[in-house]
């Protein structure tokens, strides 16, 4: 009889989400996620409520993933980031982050909140 070692348990991960930039219509922001501990590979899907924001972003060597996004409507947007897991790493979802989006005026090199 040959005995094999039990497979190692997957590492539990935690994901956080943040927004960089002016949250205003027509103004591009960067949605950032951080997965800890840093997985080898995997993707993060950002969501606005239940709606996926673009394609899933690859997790970089430092455990971060990001996507650029322009909000098309004003009001409260509930943003989350889900790490989809990777070999040896469990999936995890961030806490919700409420982003209040106002009206914006995109002047190309600068974006101004208005109203």
What are these regions (language model features)?
Residues 1-115:
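Solvent-exposed beta-strand/loop surfaces, strongest in extracytoplasmic domains of secreted
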């Amino acid at each position: 009889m040959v005995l094999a070692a039990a497979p190692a348990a997957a590492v539990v991960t935690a994901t956080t989400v943040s927004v960089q930039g002016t949250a205003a219509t027509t103004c591009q922001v960067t949605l950032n996620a951080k997965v800890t501990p840093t997985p080898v590979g995997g993707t993060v899907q950002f969501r606005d409520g239940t709606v996926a924001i673009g394609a899933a972003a690859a997790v970089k060597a430092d455990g971060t993933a990001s996507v650029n996004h322009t909000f098309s409507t004003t009001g409260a947007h509930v943003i989350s980031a889900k790490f989809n897991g990777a070999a040896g790493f469990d999936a995890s979802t961030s806490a919700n982050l409420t982003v209040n989006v106002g009206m914006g005026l995109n002047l190309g090199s600068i974006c101004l909140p208005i109203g």
